[in-house]
Amino acid sequence: MTHSVQLKILDKRLGSEFPLPAYATTGSAGLDLRACLDEPLKIEPDETCLISTGLAIYLGHSNVAATILPRSGLGHKHGIVLGNLVGLIDSDYQGPLMVSCWNRGKEPYTINPGDRIAQLVVLPILKAQFAVVEEFELTERGAGGFGSSGQN
């Protein structure tokens, strides 16, 4: 399934010096977002920096949203994760896409201009329509909380 997304290039290096967002493989769910920096940016341990991706998107339909997610290698190898853990882009947002990068590692980490820093995933959205009830239908799990379904 595909969905047309309007893309506005805010940094002219995108498409020339830096590739436009693209799926790395046919099975990729996320499009890589790049750091549109003028110079390398050193992020000290426990520091958070807001980094421009150089683009804005408009999803255009209320049944679609996008998320900005971390790149697994940056988090696992270098401790670089998203400062807000996940970014939610509503269908009617038209502003610039920014990435909050947090260095939760023990060493400084340098992000260079054009580095892949996050990924954008476009998702279908179902609008909830609440039905107020006195009791829920019985399920096997019931109201069991954290850890109630076991480890296996």
Curated annotation (Swiss-Prot):
Keyword field contains Mitochondrion: no
Cofactor(s) it depends on: Mg(2+)
Annotated keywords: Hydrolase, Magnesium, Metal-binding, Nucleotide metabolism
Enzyme class: hydrolase
Superkingdom classification of source: Bacteria
Function: This enzyme is involved in nucleotide metabolism: it produces dUMP, the immediate precursor of thymidine nucleotides and it decreases the intracellular concentration of dUTP so that uracil cannot be incorporated into DNA.
Protein name, per record: Deoxyuridine 5'-triphosphate nucleotidohydrolase
Organism expressing this protein natively: Coxiella burnetii (strain RSA 493 / Nine Mile phase I)
